[in-house]
């Protein structure tokens, strides 16, 4: 998928170059704008006959450039360059939205009357966009170390200085500006070609076979505390290991507590494929101790599906299940569009666009949904945003797999505690009855029970197996 992203990004830059060169047709459709002294932006002035065409082409060129940047996979130490190129795209879009009132250089009467604020905004956006593009050219040339890129950069700088001098002299600005825009368009095509021939970035392994109990690059991030019977904690969809710090602290005195981040979440490397129920079962099996030692699995939300499936598929390895506010596994038809989107998300999580969205909205969304800050900044990363979205899109498939598994594999006779938060009935009583489980209701708690009442979770784990369990 990373290669396809490069192709899409390159295509966007080529589209931006073509749309940004629409002024070439204006030499024939708008003869009122002087080719030698007239500024190219005058073709889109409000009083020109083809203003809508050239304004639209400028705006779409800017959006295509910004979209191209958003689709580029992240590369270390290049963020300033791509940020500058995205700024150029946005400034170009703004210039298309706010056109000149009249042909400033070609129309001698234009300067004699007052102009609107949109006229000044267009001039400001044009100047800032040019500065941003030149900065991107310099920064990318320094990173790529290509003489071709440096050639375009120096020619672009020279054309910009020549255009500024011609504007000050009010003679020859049209020729200089057209040369400048031509160089900029050719450089965008060069960027597209560079992306098409570049090597794919290395993708860290993220399969269950690559799990590393010490965390690190080779596998998911794992935190282990204490000694004693093993307790394996799996967070809800999109959750992180630090959400369970209070519960782990209460259990670490008597238990060996294992917390981890699924692929793409927390400090784990990004996922390479959409999540599935059986992948998560394999992950739990890889983290749990080998038979004959057994593990107590604590799961939250939809991750309770993973824990239940693990118990059905590996009954001899489970000592107890604690299901914290489990999500209902309802029978709904899996969505083909969701599957298609899910296949793209692991790659999209590594793009500059996902990074920008996560930086802007991630911490605020996390605080709104969970109610606590993000001390490690993990929700400011694109991979976490993509992984959380991927898990949400995979819910229907996971639920369907669990429902089939319930029909095929009996539930073992292990103690189960279902902790239910206050709020709407999510079928916890029915689940507890089906699993012969103890049902603990906490009407004063919200969904984040591990944060609001960690003692209740610890008590459910430390309680003697089978106590209060319905026969």
Spans of model-derived segments:
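Residue in the alpha/beta-hydrolase core beta-strand immediately N-terminal to the catalytic nucleophile
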Residues: 296, 319-322
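Catalytic histidine-centered segment of alpha/beta-hydrolase-like enzymes
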Residues: 442-454
């Amino acid at each position: 998928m990373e290669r396809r992203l490069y192709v899409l990004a390159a295509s966007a830059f080529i589209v931006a170059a073509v749309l940004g060169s629409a002024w070439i047709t204006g030499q024939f459709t708008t003869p009122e704008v002087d080719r030698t002294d007239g500024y190219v932006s005058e073709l889109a002035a409000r009083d020109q006959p083809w203003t809508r065409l050239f304004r639209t082409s400028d705006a779409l060129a800017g959006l295509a450039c910004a979209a191209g940047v958003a689709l580029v996979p992240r590369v270390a130490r290049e963020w300033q360059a791509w940020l500058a190129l995205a700024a150029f795209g946005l400034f170009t879009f703004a210039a298309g939205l706010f056109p000149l009132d009249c042909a400033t250089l070609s129309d001698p009467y234009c300067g004699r009357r007052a102009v609107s604020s949109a006229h000044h905004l267009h001039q400001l956006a044009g100047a800032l966009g040019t500065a941003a593009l030149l900065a991107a050219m310099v920064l990318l040339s320094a990173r790529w170390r290509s003489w071709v890129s440096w050639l375009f950069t120096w020619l672009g700088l020279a054309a910009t200085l020549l255009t500024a001098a011609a504007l000050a002299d009010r003679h020859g600005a049209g020729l200089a500006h057209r040369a400048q825009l031509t160089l900029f368009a050719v450089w965008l095509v060069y960027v597209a070609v560079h992306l098409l021939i570049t090597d794919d970035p290395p993708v860290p392994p993220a399969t269950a076979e690559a799990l590393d109990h010490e965390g690190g690059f080779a596998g998911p991030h794992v935190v282990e505390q204490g000694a004693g019977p093993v307790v394996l904690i799996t967070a809800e969809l999109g959750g992180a290991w630090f959400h369970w710090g209070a519960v782990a602290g209460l259990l670490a005195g008597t238990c060996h507590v294992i917390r981890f981040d699924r692929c793409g979440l927390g400090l784990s490397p990004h996922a390479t494929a959409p999540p599935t129920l059986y992948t998560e079962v394999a992950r739990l099996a890889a983290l749990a101790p080998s038979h004959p030692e057994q593990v107590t699995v604590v799961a939250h939300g939809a991750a309770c599906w993973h824990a239940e499936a693990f118990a059905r598929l590996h009954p001899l390895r489970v000592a107890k299940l604690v299901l914290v506010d489990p999500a209902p596994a309802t029978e709904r038809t899996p969505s083909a569009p969701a599957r298609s989107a899910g296949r793209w998300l692991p790659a999209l999580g590594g793009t500059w666009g996902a990074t920008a969205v996560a930086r802007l909205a991630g911490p605020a969304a996390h605080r709104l949904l969970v109610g606590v800050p993000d001390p490690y900044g993990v929700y400011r990363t694109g991979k976490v945003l993509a992984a959380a979205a991927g898990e949400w899109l995979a819910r229907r498939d996971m639920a369907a797999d669990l429902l089939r598994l319930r029909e095929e594999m009996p539930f073992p006779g292990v103690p189960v505690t279902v902790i239910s938060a206050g709020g709407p009935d999510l079928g916890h009583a029915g689940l507890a009855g089906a699993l012969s489980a103890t049902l603990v209701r906490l009407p004063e708690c919200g969904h984040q029970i591990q944060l609001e009442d960690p003692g209740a979770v610890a008590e459910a784990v430390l309680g003697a197996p089978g106590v209060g369990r319905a026969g």
